Amino acid sequence: MRCLIVTAHPLNPSLCQTLSNAAIDTLMDAKHQCRHVDLYRSGFFPALTPAERASYYSGFETTEVAKEIEDLLWAETIVLIFPTWWFGPPAILKGWFDRVWVPGIAYDHAADLGAIQPRLRQLRKVVAITTLGSPWWVDWLILRRPVRRVLKTAILNTCAPQASLTFLSFYKVESLPRQGVDAAINRIRSMLQHL
């Protein structure tokens, strides 16, 4: 399977980088074709440019993100690895969606600018792996898993409704002992071995 791994954490080393390395190793060991994009290390610019926004309804200006678009269209599986900050993804990952999952690539607008028509028909699976400093009950019971909800409902259901979503959250990571890190790595390996 063609797997695109997208990592979004500014620090290296970090728990996200450790989890990303485990994911890449597991997928490579399983003989999947892999491409890895580390948004911070690659210098990805997250802000939608004025030219891109001006071209939104008339053939999106893709020059600056051509490689990222090529990777998106190549992928059958996407693995996202990122921290959750303020119960949302890092700005750089949000910017990746804003600039890469665009009209004519990830979806088409209806002629009347009504319902969106999905275009990412090759995408079969998305795996999101995120770390949070908060306890699980804040995410689940108070905020009702906002990152998962946006990814599934707003992004995947409109651009790739056939794609399944697996969402792994690791909580209270700022005080996670080594055995907790090992357990997270084992959980990721187990899940990715069965793609």
Spans of features found by a protein language model:
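Glycine-rich phosphate/pyrophosphate-binding loop and the adjoining helix
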Residues: 138-195
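Residue-level recognition of the N-termini of beta-strands and the immediately preceding loop/turn
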Residues: 34-35, 123-125, 163-166
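N-terminal beta1-alpha1-beta2 submodule of the flavodoxin-like/Rossmannoid cofactor-binding fold
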Residues: 1-105, 181-195
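Short, basic/glycine-rich phosphate-binding loops at helix/coil junctions
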Residues: 43-51, 127-133, 165-167
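Active-site donor-binding loop signature of nucleotide-sugar glycosyltransferases
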Residues: 39, 84, 131, 170-172
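Short, structured loop/turn "capping" segments at alpha-beta junctions
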Residues: 103-108, 161-165
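A structural motif corresponding to the C-terminal end of an alpha-helix
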Residues: 30, 75, 81, 122, ...
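Short, glycine-/small-residue-rich phosphate/pyrophosphate-handling segment
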Residues: 109-155
